[in-house]
Design a protein with these regions (language model features):
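Acidic, divalent-metal-binding catalytic cores of TOPRIM
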Residues: 1-180
Length: 180
C-alpha cells in the first residue's frame, strides 16, 4: 500500500505586492506558457530576448545528443522588473530554479526638457545623469535569492559579458551569430 500525497499551497502566504501582481498579470498576457515553470523540469529565468534566444539555441543543439536539456524550461521575464516577482512565486512553491539577468550600470544618461530654452515649436533638451532604474532592481532580485535559487548576473549586459561587445539593435540575431 503506497501512500500518495499532494502538497497544497496557500496563495495568501506568498508576499506579492501590487507591483508583483501587476507584473505577473502582464507576463501572462505576453507569454501564456509561463505556467510551464510550475509543472516540473529545470527552470531558467532569463531577463530578455537575447538570453532567451541564446539558451533556446543551445538547448536545441545540445538536446540532439544529450537528454540533460530535454526538461529545461526557459522562461523569458521580458525585463528585469519582472524577474523578482517571478522569483517570489517560485520561492513560494519551493521550486529549484536559475536566473540570468544583466547588472546594468548604476547611472545612465537621460534627457529633460529645458523649459527656459524651449518653445511650443522647438524643444531643447538637457542631458542629465540619473540613477539607472534597471540598477535598482538588482537589490529586489538579491532579496529573493534562496538556497533553491542560483542567480547569475551578466556584468553590465549579456553581450558585454559573453561577447565583449556593445550591441544597440538586432541583439538576438547578433547573439546567435556569435554562438555559431
Amino acid at each position: 500500500n503506497d501512500i500518495e500525497a499532494s502538497t497544497l499551497y496557500r496563495p495568501e502566504n506568498v508576499q506579492l505586492d501590487a507591483d508583483d501582481k501587476e507584473n505577473l498579470k502582464l507576463m501572462n498576457l505576453f507569454d501564456s506558457h509561463i505556467s510551464q515553470a510550475f509543472f516540473g523540469g529545470k527552470i531558467l529565468i532569463v531577463e530578455g530576448d537575447t538570453e532567451y534566444s541564446a539558451f533556446n539555441y543551445i538547448r536545441e543543439k545540445e538536446s540532439l545528443s544529450n537528454e540533460h536539456y530535454h526538461d529545461l524550461n526557459i522562461i523569458r521575464a521580458r525585463g528585469k522588473v519582472t524577474v523578482a516577482s517571478m522569483m517570489k512565486v517560485l520561492n513560494h512553491f519551493k521550486n529549484k530554479y536559475y536566473v540570468l539577468h544583466d547588472t546594468d550600470t548604476q547611472q545612465c544618461l537621460s534627457k529633460r526638457i529645458n523649459k527656459d530654452l524651449s518653445s511650443d515649436k522647438h524643444k531643447v533638451y538637457d542631458t542629465i545623469t540619473i540613477t539607472n532604474p534597471a540598477w535598482t532592481n538588482n537589490n529586489k532580485i538579491k532579496a529573493q535569492m534562496t538556497n533553491k535559487s542560483r542567480v547569475i548576473a551578466s556584468l553590465i549586459n549579456f553581450e558585454s559579458a559573453y561577447f565583449a561587445e556593445t550591441v544597440e539593435s538586432d541583439k538576438p540575431e547578433n547573439c546567435i551569430n556569435n554562438i555559431k
